[in-house]
Amino acid sequence: ESLIADRNYNQLIPDNLADPSVSKFGDTYYLYGTTDLDYGLGRAGTPVVWKSKDFVNWSFEGSHISGFDWSKGYDYTNDKGEKKKGYFRYWAPGKVIEQDGKFYLYVTFVKPDDKMGTYVLVADRPDGPFHFTAGQGLLPPGEEGTDSPAVVDDIDGEPFIDDDGSGYIFWRRRNAGRLSADRLHLDGEPVTLATARQGYSEGPVMFKRKGIYYYIYTLSGHQNYVNAYMMSRESPLTGFVKPEGNDIFLFSSPENQVWGPGHGNVFYDEGTDEYIFLYLEYGDGGTTRQVYANRMEFNDDGTIKTLIPDMRGVGYLAASQETRPNLALQSHFYASSEKSPRTSVVNIETQPNQPLPEKGSVKSYTRTHTYQATHVADESNGTRWMAADTDSSPFITVDLKEIRKVGECQFYFTRPTEGHTWRLEKSIDGKHWQMCAEQGKVQACSPHIAKEIGETRYLRLHIRRGDAGLWEWKIYE
């Protein structure tokens, strides 16, 4: 299983992701999210669907949506007549729902001119390919044609299907409405939900447990992102009251190294009768976020127990899909270069439910991320090796410490959604090298896999195209 007895399961995914939601169909968990590239909110990465059968080992292959070039900047003229450049962006996919053998994805698209809305896409499989249900999709600025219509002209649309089959959608700024029977349109006028706390809010979630409707809404943002909730015994749109106890049920835990637990989703696991909250974490600030998951617990009156987020996470929800010993854990890694450390200093409100006057409960915290080669063998999705920005031919080498027969290597690259090419070499003595595997065409997947490597003591991975970094390098006999 794992040589690291105290293994942490947060961060959940080996990539920078935000706004996660999870659905389970058959024996597979599907995770949807916003792909972060550290370019700010003006540009996002290629959207993908991460899949797992055990909630620990996650992978993806390619994108579930075609017809967009996410890396292309489009020129447009804004309302003030200024020339600008912008990108298509895919944000905050809601929980995918199944109806009559079709899968419905509600997701925010932002156009290059920053016009945005929540759209519904449909597919025959939960991992796509997904298509717009009407119109020609979304057209670049200046192109003739008809854009597909949005369900709502705002962001963070999140669907909810009640026990009687009626559908609802919730979006930012506490807005909500009924969905038509075909799930494609609003039915009637939207409403605004009254919450106990004021202030800007996004990333809403609705779920139902034992006859109680729970409306989760975010407050603040960045390192002070929190999740608050209201309860109703009436309906998804009415009767909400402030719960007893901490209505902000999830907030930063600096002692556990979790900052700004924000926009997320609730996943109910029927197999274990558990509720799991998935959420984004601050990372290094901006769009360097990562996905965390922790179990939710409830009091007898239905209120949510304050969730103290941690690195431990959830762990396996089904039998582990990887039982082979990972040779990397006993091996020595070194690289052509290592990126300089990155330090963040933030002020965090440590008591958001009852802040002390004059910012008395605001404290300063520091975190530093390093990018050493050894990070690729620590069973953590939150640490990585990255080559220096000036390194024009980056590589990373492993010494297995003795000659082993290697059957498979798995490479979990950084920014995997943007694609990589690479070359793998092997050596018995560390001096004479021969190529044993190659990815010559740009491929976006995680992990990349090299097989049938044979006897060797040393392996050297050259990253030819794509981001020069690895979250993990797993090695099996």
Regions found by a protein language model. Name each.
Residues 1-92, 97-199, 208-213, 218-255, ...:
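Beta-rich carbohydrate-recognition and catalytic domains
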Residues 218, 234, 262, 269-271, ...:
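Short, loop-centered acidic/histidine patches that primarily coordinate divalent metals
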Residues 378-437, 441-477:
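Aromatic, loop-rich ligand-recognition surfaces of beta-strand-rich domains
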